[in-house]
């Protein structure tokens, strides 16, 4: 009733407890298990925040903003903008779950001196409202944590790639 939230938040034990306490404070008689039973049923639709973001975007106006973004990177490779465009479309396709059979096996690799805004460019790929699905800190030496990050984040900037050992590269 009064405690309804309009913004997506990841659900954890703390959030479940808050839902139960808020409902009880509003006079709704229930048990903790009632909340879990409802939340983990088909009555609550699966929510994908990136899909929701993409769905709310206006229709495409025909302007190629991806190649325009790629062109902001100083690069002598004549294929850079086309390759970045292909990678970007594949990334979004994977966000939407269109291609679960194949992984995106291509990743842009930005090479340059310290302080040339490589990480800033990577961060700018994600819109501000979706930046919680971006990270630039991943530790490949801890396999379990790395696998969790690969599932949790939509875009991972592997900063200092030259320091990742060949066994950790895959």
Question: Residue locations for each model-derived region?
Answer:
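Intein modules and their embedded homing endonuclease domains
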Residues: 1-60
């Amino acid at each position: 009733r009064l405690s309804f939230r309009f913004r997506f938040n990841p659900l954890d034990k703390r959030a479940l407890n808050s839902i139960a306490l808020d409902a009880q404070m509003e006079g709704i008689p229930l048990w903790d298990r009632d909340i879990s039973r409802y939340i983990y049923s088909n009555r609550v639709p699966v929510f994908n925040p990136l899909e929701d973001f993409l769905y709310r975007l206006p229709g495409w106006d025909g302007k190629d903003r991806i190649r325009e973004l790629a062109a902001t990177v100083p690069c002598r490779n004549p294929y850079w903008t086309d390759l970045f465009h292909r990678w970007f479309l594949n990334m979004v396709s994977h966000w939407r779950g269109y291609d679960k059979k194949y992984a995106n096996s291509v990743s842009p690799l930005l090479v340059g001196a310290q302080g040339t805004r490589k990480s800033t460019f990577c961060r700018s790929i994600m819109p501000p409202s979706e930046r919680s699905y971006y990270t630039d800190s991943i530790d490949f030496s801890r396999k379990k944590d790395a696998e969790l990050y690969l599932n949790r984040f939509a875009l991972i900037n592997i900063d200092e790639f030259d320091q990742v050992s060949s066994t950790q590269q895959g």
